A protein has these predicted regions:
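Basic, flexible Lys/Arg- and Gly-enriched helix-loop patches that mediate nucleic-acid binding at interfaces
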Residues: 1-142
Length: 142
């Protein structure tokens, strides 16, 4: 029984219980979240729902999304408080490939594939890093 709130706990050796229920220490939390359109990949936003608004059973309050998806984009997003893992996944020096699937309204041409391979100028200081564009399936209007 701890009488002082500042009592230190050894997470490897001590057992902590509250109202008779054992509380297990979790250093990191991991959520694989299917981000809906209209939601921003941020920890807080005064205008839009954030991915964090959907995580209601978190143990830690230091969770963050690993990477981002645009507001109109849907897809899987990792949410964690594991900074080392985030660095391993996001650091350009680690060369972790990312895969995106998109439904395109219009035709994708060979020139588009080449532009992706060379990097695309999106109006920032430098063009995007080279990427592989693969056409998996085409949709036809009937």
């Amino acid at each position: 029984m701890a009488a002082k709130p500042e009592t230190k706990v050894d997470t490897d050796a001590d057992e902590v219980s509250v109202n008779g229920r054992i509380v297990k220490y979790q250093r990191y939390e991991y959520y694989l979240f299917n981000k809906p359109s209209g939601c921003v990949s941020a920890t807080c936003d005064n205008v839009h729902d954030t991915v964090m608004d959907y995580i209601t059973d978190a143990v830690h309050d230091d969770l963050f999304p690993v990477g981002r998806l645009d507001i109109d984009t849907e897809g899987l997003l990792l949410i964690t408080n594991d900074g080392a893992l985030s660095h391993e996944l996001l650091s350009p020096s680690k060369h972790v490939a990312k895969t995106y699937y998109a439904r395109i309204d219009g035709e994708v041409t060979w020139d588009d594939i080449i532009r992706f391979k060379e990097g695309i100028d999106i109006g920032e200081e430098r063009p995007t890093k080279p990427a592989e564009l693969v056409i998996k399936k085409t949709w036809q209007r009937i």
